[in-house]
Amino acid sequence: MEVDSKKSSDVVTKLPQKRFYRQRAHSNPIADHSFQYPAHPDEYEWSQHYPDIGDRRVAFADIGCGYGGFLVTLGEIYPDKFAVGMEIRVKVSDYVMDRIDALRKLHEGQYRNVACIRTNAMKYLTNFFHKAQLEKMFFLYPDPHFKKAKHKWRIINSALLSEYSYVLRKGGLIYTVTDVRDLHEWMCKHIEQHPAFERLSEAEVEADILSEKLLDSSEEGKKVTRNKGDKFVAIFRRV
């Protein structure tokens, strides 16, 4: 996407630099953070994030969106769909918000379909989304919580899967990616055991337009690539 030279000379907007938004890799999802959230999805003013949303609803949710690389890619691939990133870390969510704001100024009329909200998706997901609202949910490189005592904090678990099945429409998809084999096996086991989901075949995964983007669009994915790490992908359908 090229920016008109005259227009770019008149605009001093620059993309934010991550080095000014550094924060620890993960945040405790059980801690008592201070969040603002609606009592019901109808009470949330989505227009504050999406100027053109009108009566439409968000279709994609990137849970733990990190620095927003994949979220921005979603906005480019699906210009007619609204995607939200949910991030618990304050500095990281600030970066994504500033990044989207800068992209909108640099590319007039674009990136108006993506936004980031600082919240705890493990606690407040159903406060933001109606039943059967979402078409896709993404869990890219989530915190592995290696210690067994902290496995209950993992973003994929039996209790939370019931909430995900509630906000996902029939035929909707859950995408998971991690560089930790143990976490990959954990997520697959729990999702496959849940009666509301079925795993896509390898052929279906390969045919999905987002499969390649899942691996390297996010900043974490690029880091894993640089370090020559493994990447484990699985996609599940809401039945």
Swiss-Prot record:
Gene3D superfamilies: Vaccinia Virus protein VP39. It comes from the Eukaryota. GO terms for cellular component: nucleus; tRNA methyltransferase complex. It catalyses: guanosine(46) in tRNA + S-adenosyl-L-methionine = N(7)-methylguanosine(46) in tRNA + S-adenosyl-L-homocysteine. Its main location: nucleus. It is found in: Nucleus. Its EC number is 2.1.1.33. The active site is at 143. One of its GO terms (molecular function) is tRNA binding. It is an enzyme of class 2 (transferase). Keywords: Methyltransferase, Nucleus, RNA-binding, S-adenosyl-L-methionine, Transferase, tRNA processing, tRNA-binding. S-adenosyl-L-methionine binds at residues 64, 87-88, 120-121, 140, 218-220. Pathway: tRNA modification; N(7)-methylguanine-tRNA biosynthesis. Belongs to the class I-like SAM-binding methyltransferase superfamily. TrmB family. Catalyzes the formation of N(7)-methylguanine at position 46 (m7G46) in tRNA. PANTHER family: 3-DEOXY-D-MANNO-OCTULOSONIC-ACID TRANSFERASE/TRNA GUANINE-N 7 - -METHYLTRANSFERASE, TRNA (GUANINE-N(7)-)-METHYLTRANSFERASE. This is tRNA (guanine-N(7)-)-methyltransferase. It comes from Culex quinquefasciatus.
